[in-house]
Amino acid sequence: MRVLAITGYKPYELNIFSNNHPAVSYIQLAIRRRLLSLLEEGLEWIVISGQLGVELWAAEIAYDLREEYPQLQVAILTPFLNQEERWNEMNREYYEWIVSQADFVDSITKRPYESPAQFRWKNEWIVRKSDGLLIVYDEEKEGTPKYMLEVAKRKENYAIFPITFSDLQAIIEEAQINETQIDNRFDF
């Protein structure tokens, strides 16, 4: 697999209203683990649409992994021009920081927002141009990632790597066990 699309929930869909929320680090750890195994198999590009939440958190992880895997490149393909225009200042600054480090940035429709169809076109285009999809999504909690997942399921020979709430819960439990083990070393 050379090109991996990544998507998932937007922050508000997870009741996350800050990038410092503890859940973000667990989501990023899950993404990091999946990316590491795919990098060992030859992954070269990740593609995101630049939406807030999982996509930008994944880009952060990709930038961190570049130290060890300099071949990893990030493409941000927005559904329309200036998608960040109506975001608050903090989100815009975070987005601009992510975009500033990307290897490739473009708009799929090359027009400002006109209709919800631009989101559908974005999903179809990104799936068509990638070899697989890493998606933070649980079908028991519907959200916006379902639309890209539906497109991905229709493409033949297309790998889908889900990260579900069960996967995230396992990571949280593992972290808690490790934290307890560390704390116990210093009990006198």
UniProtKB/Swiss-Prot annotation:
<comment type="similarity">
    <text>Belongs to the UPF0398 family.</text>
</comment>
<dbReference type="Pfam" id="PF06908">
    <property type="entry name" value="YpsA"/>
</dbReference>
<protein>
    <recommendedName>
        <fullName>UPF0398 protein GWCH70_1907</fullName>
    </recommendedName>
</protein>
<dbReference type="InterPro" id="IPR010697">
    <property type="entry name" value="YspA"/>
</dbReference>
